[in-house]
Amino acid sequence: MNDQHWGPSISADIVVIGGGTAGIGLVASLLKRSPHLNITVIEPDSRHFYQPAWTLVGGGAYNVENTVRPMASVMPRGVNWVQAAVTGIDPDHGRLILSDARTVSYKNLIVCPGLRLAWEKIEGLEETLGQHGVTSNYSYRHATYTWDQVQKLRGGKVLFTQPAMPIKCAGAPQKALYLSCDHWNRAGVLNNIDVEFNLAGAALFGVATFVPPLMKYIEKYNARLAFNSNLVKVDGPAKTAWFDIKDAEGTVTRQAKTFDLLHVVPPQVAPDFVARSPLADAAGWCEVDPHSLQHPRYPGVFALGDICGTSNAKTAAAVRKQIVVVAENLLALRKQRPLPLKYDGYGSCPLTVEKGKVILAEFGYAGKLLPTFPLDPTTPRRSAWWLKATLLPWFYWNGMLKGREWLTRLSRVD
């Protein structure tokens, strides 16, 4: 970074990059523990979204307007909110550069900007998304279009896609399939619809325990699975999508498939300012110790949420646990004490297999099952639907973003 191009500087103590679930939740938890902390949050967006409900919006089970609030209404009191984007990180000198050329110096840095949806990596997608039957529940603007198109469809060919991992909420691509098929089944038109799920990977779900119960629903809805099939191009007006298909020998061929409805999940990458920084791992994500969530080379830096280069599921449930780990470990570091807490990789994916029933998949590193409740986690339950559709959204706005920590029991360092 060249000093001569920098604008006015901001001197800060604790700096948090990102005002999403991880950023706001962490700041609220830090202030609960130590109300006099000097915290600066850098977040350009004027709105805050509850993204886990967008799958429900696409299935006609949630009002999209209830998934967004003004950022100012969720920003904890007493925080210095800098409404700008970060364009560079210089951890060797403890400073950031912003989109308006200002610089921010810090003593401790928390990296939690989320990830970037790389729509542009699929040729033709940005031009046609939200029209011609091309949609995505990964977008606030288009989740309602999903439901509109699902209701209108009475027959034809439907393609659902899932890109290469990692992505946020790895179960969301198939949730779109299940809720759509459930609607068509109830409407009596499912037999007129050819449903195909194209996955860039070779497994329906990353934790093998949950594959058999999910396969029962794939079979119930008569959906066809196309593994190692990666969406690379879309022509909306021509109702055609192209996939790169890899065979057992690793040979890739491109195949065109027509559709009446296409639900796309875009590739997902780290924001450029992280991927280009010294904080990044080889894949561009923020490198951290998988248990302490502290950067291995810059001890004053922690990360949490989707940006982490850890193998856990990128979900809000993971963030709920990570918040406590980072809050406790950061405060211990500032007091020059050993870091007390370790993260076990917990993540949760409430798989909405039909309207009114959810398979609640909870697991940690290496796919270890970590159920919260003493029930068979592979059984679809109405109670889990209530948790997903009613309790968790309420707790998000009224608990998690206000520093209230629920079901966050964690392991302490031996």
Regions found by a protein language model. Name each.
Residues 126-154, 258-321:
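FAD-site-proximal beta/loop scaffold in flavoenzymes
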Residues 19, 100, 113-114, 245, ...:
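Glycine-rich, N-terminal phosphate-binding loop of Rossmann-like dinucleotide-binding domains
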Residues 36, 79-89, 93-96, 104, ...:
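A Rossmann-like FAD-binding core segment of flavoenzymes
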Residues 1-12, 80-188, 252, 263:
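FAD-binding core/adjacent interface of flavoenzyme oxidoreductases
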